[in-house]
């Protein structure tokens, strides 16, 4: 999911869109290095991939808020590349004892992507200009002034990661009024 398509994230998006009837889905990989070995999938495998308890929310967001959300997400994860030698991901060097290593600047569970829309990310552009939403996944036009139903987890829907507050510009005290449905069971 950090470098391109991810079957797991595609699966999460598909489930969220199907279960909610939403127009757009937001989801994060949640873990950078989790893996499932070949063979039967167990409940514990799923918990290693999706370890946090969350409900599934459906919220009302405008097209402009969706774009702002994605701008914030990708600004937290992608460098503004000025040359082919620059890292795509926003990384920082750290030292642990005698060892040097590189890690993400931000938590992996705050890197959301979207489904239900066709969009591009230009990593040579600054925050606010990285995201271009071309159209809805069904080919219909995307309208920044229209209100869309968006599926996302409750951590994000309650303001976690600040993608809705700082990114979309929705005041924290308004988030609850944007929720149009919540599951009564944990997503896992």
Predicted segments with their positions:
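Catalytic centers of hydrolytic enzymes
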Residues: 1-188
């Amino acid at each position: 999911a950090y470098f391109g398509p991810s079957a797991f994230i595609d699966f999460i998006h598909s489930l969220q869109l199907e279960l909610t009837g939403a127009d757009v889905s937001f989801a994060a990989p949640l873990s950078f290095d989790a893996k499932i070995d070949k063979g039967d999938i167990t409940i514990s495998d799923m918990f290693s991939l999706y370890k946090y308890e969350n409900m599934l929310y459906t919220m009302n967001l405008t097209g402009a808020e969706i774009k702002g959300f994605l701008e914030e997400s990708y600004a937290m994860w992608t460098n503004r590349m000025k040359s082919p030698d620059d890292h795509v991901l926003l990384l920082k060097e750290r030292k642990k004892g005698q060892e040097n290593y590189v890690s993400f600047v931000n938590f992996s569970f705050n890197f959301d992507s979207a489904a239900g829309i066709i969009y591009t990310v230009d990593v040579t552009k600054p925050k606010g200009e990285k995201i271009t939403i071309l159209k809805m996944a069904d080919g219909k036009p995307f309208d920044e002034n229209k209100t869309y139903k968006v599926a996302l987890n409750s951590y994000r829907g309650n303001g976690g990661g600040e993608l809705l507050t700082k990114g979309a510009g929705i005041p924290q005290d308004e988030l609850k009024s944007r929720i149009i449905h919540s599951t009564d069971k944990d997503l896992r």
